[in-house]
């Protein structure tokens, strides 16, 4: 890490929990490699404390920050401007402080689709099942539709406070892209079975299975897995969740959220600094399979 001076620019991650995050490693190493006078820190901030945290960071002149669970939706109402993709998604994971104006972006969809390509897959014309309706889910759904998926089926609890918003999101995304985007109740087991049976890709876009709850999984019935299915998990700690472990045992190809994190972070880095993250070096140092 570079020596911190009175001129050092601040960037950060706001979420809860954040102690497990490798974002500080990748960003601080990138700043060092490129000779940029910035530092990246993590702050444990939830939805209740987010408004005060953002106000304080803005006052202190932060250059930019990332949002992770559970803050990607709540942050929207605290910003001055949204990029086109953030407007479409309704969630933000990256904020730029442009001379006191906070501008929200969403690099999650971009990051996820880059990770799909890294894993050797192409979703063009394919059916996709997505679990969850949080900020990461909306970004992934939007990018999947924009990148040519035939259908995107979203599953969530009908009692979720985001249900109505997601219903409108699905209708709007379908109208804008021509992709069939539909919302289903998690408890509709028949719909879930049918959707996964017809899907090329199943994505867990929730925090289920993340440390410390590593024995939990979003898919309880392993008979839903089939060998033609690719299973992705946005969780990367642990690197192999129970979902991925059981899917692999059923003959599925699997990949986790590590490369999504890498690519969305690289995009955020470029937004803040105007420079490209040295991805190959960062990938080798921090994202090699353990």
Located regions from the model:
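Rossmann-like adenosine-cofactor binding region
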Residues: 179-254
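Short, conserved loop/helix-junction motifs that constitute active-site signature segments
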Residues: 4-7, 123-124, 146, 219-228
